């Protein structure tokens, strides 16, 4: 039993971080990062900074990034990427649910990408994000979650118990926008669509709290002719629009 536990621990500590870094380095995720991450401004909290794949996409409007992640191996990779950039990065080796060592209303932008799926207590983590984010601040999220299509959602429910075990706690069936709004955030820009690949794993939910619609326009332009629809929610009017 000890050998089995050691193997699981080795996989989670050393192998899985490498798999995550490789899996998240592709054309589709890079396009999403390029459309959203440059919107970040000022003092940034990135929850689930992982291997630092967002770092090259931050603009010069960012003063500093506070990167939270419990994985020391992913953080080691991220530190190398941070050294190659010009933005100051303060790494916080902890879970997002824990009390963040940041003052209330001290952050201009919170960024979370493909991380809400795997945080054990996502509501508690979102409350921490809300605590540190300024009233006028922006929340930027790029996530995957529960599909609206019943046939796909059924498979997400079936696959998730095993998927969590091999994917570092990743849930395929979390309702991302519901989690965010339940934490008290007002989503002003929300898009939903499937990326290429198996649909239970690729239902994508990017969005933000803020009033800048440039990402919506840029994303629509970049996907023109792809045959995929991009839907957006204007939360101020509660209307779905296609951008």
Language-model-detected regions and their locations in the chain:
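A short glycine-rich, Lys/Arg-flanked "PGG" loop and its adjoining helix->strand segment in the class I
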Residues: 123-135
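Short alpha-helix
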Residues: 168-184
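Class I SAM-dependent methyltransferase SAM/SAH-binding core
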Residues: 45-47, 51-99
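A short acidic, Gly/Pro-enriched loop at the edge of an enzyme's catalytic core
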Residues: 97-109
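Conserved alpha-helix/loop element of class I SAM-dependent methyltransferases that forms part
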Residues: 23-43, 53-57
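A short SAM/SAH-binding and catalytic strip from SAM-dependent methyltransferases
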Residues: 108-121
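Conserved beta-strand signature within the Rossmann-like core of class I S-adenosyl-L-methionine
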Residues: 136-144
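Conserved S-adenosyl-L-methionine
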Residues: 185-196
